[in-house]
């Protein structure tokens, strides 16, 4: 921490390889053998009186001669209970506009290739139930 200036910096990086695959970084919560596993909570701190709070970026690196990596966000399988949710939300504001969620597929400048697709699909069901819903709504003005 710092009383003046910039606080500390943490750089977590796996090893590199000149001829093979670079190292991996795994962050895992603790196992709960008789109960729940632990949480992983990733967040920035609040800002001071005249600044913004920090940003979180999750991205793969650029690939110059092959495909770049994927970013996957998901919940785990549940054998007997309800599977976990994936929620994406942005903040509200008391004096300014609310945050924006933008979902867009990748484009290409190559004439012989198509742009990426964006797909929204509900979950399938067992033979005696219906599949999940897809709901879009617009909030009312206050």
Where do the PLM segments sit?
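Surface-exposed, glycine- and small/polar-enriched segments that build interaction surfaces at terminal
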Residues: 1-142
């Amino acid at each position: 921490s710092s009383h003046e200036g910039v606080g500390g910096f943490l750089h977590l990086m796996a090893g590199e390889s000149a001829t093979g695959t670079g190292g991996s970084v795994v962050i895992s919560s603790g196992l709960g053998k008789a109960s729940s596993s632990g949480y992983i909570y990733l967040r920035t701190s609040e800002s001071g009186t005249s600044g913004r709070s920090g940003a979180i970026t999750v991205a793969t690196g650029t690939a110059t001669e092959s495909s770049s990596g994927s970013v996957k966000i998901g919940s785990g399988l549940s054998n007997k209970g309800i599977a976990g949710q994936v929620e994406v939300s942005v903040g509200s504001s008391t004096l300014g506009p609310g945050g924006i969620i933008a979902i867009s597929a990748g484009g290409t400048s190559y004439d012989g290739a198509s742009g990426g697709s964006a797909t929204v699909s509900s979950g399938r069901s067992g033979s005696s139930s219906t599949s999940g819903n897809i709901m879009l709504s617009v909030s009312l003005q206050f």
